[in-house]
Amino acid sequence: MLSQLPMISKLLFVILILFILQALGGYYQVKNYRATVREIHKLGNVGIGQKKGKFFNGNIVMVASDSDGIIKGVVILDGITFLSKFHSVDEFLGKPLVGSSIYSFLEVTDGFDKKERKQYMGWIRAFEALRTRFEAQEDSAELEDAENIEEV
């Protein structure tokens, strides 16, 4: 059947098949992302960071921690195709993750130069997302305390 089609029709057919495969792959990747977010959220507060790559070196990092900033679990998605899946990570910069404080990693990453920050951007954004969440919770608690004092 394909041998009877003109060359341009064959090319369009191949492009259509690739488009359909990409759409299906995108669907399953979003489904995997949502399931992973639900699963890691069970461990505590979640910070998500993304490093966009031009072609091959992007990633998505999810860090779960308790309200004190102690890491309970980390997963990362890195790969070049829609077939990539999240996997657990035990270490970052040669240090164990689970049981460590996000603040200890933020101290290290705050000292990174521009090139290192770019390389570890997904990690940095995940840690910073948690720090921002905890600071907002502290500010909210302080505001609530101040309002309670004013009422008395």
Locations of regions flagged by a protein language model:
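Acidic, Ser/Thr-rich low-complexity segments on the non-lumenal side of membrane proteins
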Residues: 51-83
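Short, strongly hydrophobic alpha-helical membrane anchors
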Residues: 1-9
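Intrinsically disordered, low-complexity acidic regions enriched in Pro/Ser/Thr
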Residues: 2, 36-43, 88, 93-96, ...
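Cytosol-/stroma-facing membrane-proximal "stalk/adaptor" domains immediately downstream
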Residues: 103-152
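Single-pass alpha-helical transmembrane signal-anchor segments
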Residues: 10-27
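Glycine-rich, charged/polar anion/phosphate-binding loops
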Residues: 46-50
